[in-house]
Amino acid sequence: MTNIRKSHPLIKIINQSFIDLPAPSNISSWWNFGSLLGICLALQIVTGLFLAMHYTSDTDTAFNSVSHMCRDVNYGWVLRYLHANGASMFFICLYLHVGRGIYYGSYMFKETWNMGVILLFAVMATAFLGYVLPWGQMSFWGATVITNLLSAIPYVGTDLVAWIWGGFAVDKATLTRFFAFHFLLPFIIAALVMVHLLFLHETGSNNPTGIPSNMDMIPFHPYYTIKDILGLFVMILVLSSLVMFSPDMLGDPDNYTPANPLSTPPHIKPEWYFLFAYAILRSIPNKLGGVLALVFSILVLFIFPLLHTSKQRSMAFRPFSQCLFWLLIANLLTLTWIGGQPVEQPYIIIGQLASILYFLIIIVIMPLTSLMENHLMKW
């Protein structure tokens, strides 16, 4: 008699995706982040659902409803901080996942990679919408500043901003629609994740060597399920430590002040995970130019497969490319630091140089270095 997991129409799909899935025998812990991202998404949906039961999307009561959750709801503070810091964990895993994809050449699975970049955009949009909901000072002014950037679009910009706001300023209509979209988007993300996995299982996983591993595969369960559970425990440890000991470490103190349209905070800045893009936006003294640079800082990921000039897929055996990769990481950390600083010298010039270097490394220096390495291998 055939095992039920291999014959049942529904369980069969799960079996082929998570149990009997052939996986390369040499994938390292850098391949753990896909499963961690799935767990982060599930955590965000569950905690978000319970928070939505107590939240009111009205400008008069939104701030107080969040306060009420933390004070009066049983373990409401745990839900709230799990959700807020869960978003930070989500982005840490996302950036590590993308970084691994760049380092090991996983972007050569074009459909999977492009789907992943679309997912990144969707998660960033969801996080931005969620940051507006507590209706603190930084929520209100962040929403005002970021949505206002759309007015840089020629001809339709001003109308588009008024349309998104639902009026002539960020107000009740804006908050209500932001809540509606923030609730909806995670389910769209979950559907996109299914497509992402569908494309991945068409080709199979990449591995650290970048060499096809069809002749050396092992079943996903128990080998990689156990390995993923270890990663999960590490993430739970980090997240629970954050939530229990310093839940506000990654937040902004300004968001504990109710939104006031008549008082602008001294430094308007987004959450830490957007600071690198915010620094690129601010480094260009022209509104439209800044918006384009901001969008292209993420869109540039789409062209990675086109910029791959090396004969080797992975960077594992390419020391010069490795140096450039870590230079890019250092550059991104510099941009993240600059994004949180006031707009004054020397931060302005550092931000401008780091922004130029960011695009230069990806579009020019990395492809040229790969070509040079191809020639070195002939010797």
From Swiss-Prot:
One of its GO terms (biological process) is mitochondrial electron transport, ubiquinol to cytochrome c. Its cofactor is heme b. The keyword Mitochondrion applies. PROSITE patterns: CYTB_CTER, CYTB_NTER. GO terms for molecular function: metal ion binding; ubiquinol-cytochrome-c reductase activity. It is found in: Mitochondrion inner membrane. Binds 2 heme b groups non-covalently. A ubiquinone binds at residue 201. Heme b b562 binds at residues 83, 182. Its main location: mitochondrion. Gene3D superfamilies: Cytochrome Bc1 Complex, Chain C. It is a multi-pass membrane protein. The chain crosses the membrane at residues 33-53, 77-98, 113-133, 178-198, 226-246, 288-308, 320-340, 347-367. Keywords: Electron transport, Heme, Iron, Membrane, Metal-binding, Mitochondrion, Mitochondrion inner membrane, Respiratory chain, Transmembrane, Transmembrane helix, Transport, Ubiquinone. Heme b b566 binds at residues 97, 196. InterPro entries: Cyt_b/b6_C, Cyt_b/b6_C_sf, Cyt_b/b6_N, Cytb/b6-like_sf, Cytochrome_b, Cytochrome_b_C_euk/bac, Cytochrome_b_N_euk/bac, Di-haem_cyt_TM. PANTHER family: CYTOCHROME B (PTHR19271:SF16). Belongs to the cytochrome b family. Heme 1 (or BL or b562) is low-potential and absorbs at about 562 nm, and heme 2 (or BH or b566) is high-potential and absorbs at about 566 nm. The cytochrome bc1 complex contains 11 subunits: 3 respiratory subunits (MT-CYB, CYC1 and UQCRFS1), 2 core proteins (UQCRC1 and UQCRC2) and 6 low-molecular weight proteins (UQCRH/QCR6, UQCRB/QCR7, UQCRQ/QCR8, UQCR10/QCR9, UQCR11/QCR10 and a cleavage product of UQCRFS1). This cytochrome bc1 complex then forms a dimer. Component of the ubiquinol-cytochrome c reductase complex (complex III or cytochrome b-c1 complex) that is part of the mitochondrial respiratory chain. The b-c1 complex mediates electron transfer from ubiquinol to cytochrome c. Contributes to the generation of a proton gradient across the mitochondrial membrane that is then used for ATP synthesis. This is Cytochrome b.
